[in-house]
């Protein structure tokens, strides 16, 4: 759908404006989401937008449905913001974070240079 391409572009621009590029997210993708992603999908049959977060590849936190893109957009961006807040809390409490992001981690993880990324 052409409108979903436009909506995806809008979300990508918002993500860039907010400085959220290092976060994990999936926007109207046909592929299965990865670990720790915030996902926005559109169900053509139900005509609903769904927002949810994945944990590992096989599980997710409850799906929230929205009738309009504007509602879904706000929820998606809020979810990303909440990911930042929770991981900042984890850092403050010396707990492991879900993944590395400069938005909450002071130092990048130690990466073995012999392992290709």
Language-model regions: role of each:
Residues 1-33, 114-117:
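Negatively charged, low-complexity tracts enriched in Asp/Glu with abundant Ser/Thr
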Residues 62, 72-76, 87-88:
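Short, surface-exposed linear patches
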Residues 82-117:
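Intrinsically disordered, low-complexity charged/polar segments
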Residues 67-81:
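A short, charged, amphipathic alpha-helix used as a generic interaction element across diverse proteins
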Residues 32-62, 79:
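Short aromatic-glycine-(Arg/Gly/Cys) micro-motifs in beta-strand/loop hairpins
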Residues 28, 52, 61-63, 92, ...:
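Local beta-strand/beta-hairpin segments that build beta-sheet-rich folds
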Residues 5, 63-67:
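Conserved aromatic
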């Amino acid at each position: 759908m052409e409108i979903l391409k436009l909506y995806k572009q809008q979300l990508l621009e918002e993500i860039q404006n907010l400085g959220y590029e290092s976060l994990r997210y999936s926007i109207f993708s046909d592929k299965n989401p990865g670990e720790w992603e915030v996902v926005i999908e559109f169900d053509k049959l139900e005509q609903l937008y769904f927002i949810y977060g994945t944990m590992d590849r096989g599980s997710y936190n409850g799906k929230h449905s929205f009738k309009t893109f504007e509602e879904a957009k706000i929820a998606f961006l809020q979810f990303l913001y909440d990911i930042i807040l929770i991981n900042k809390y984890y850092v403050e409490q010396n707990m492991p974070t879900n993944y590395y992001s400069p938005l909450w981690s002071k130092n990048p993880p130690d990466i073995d240079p012999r392992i290709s990324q």
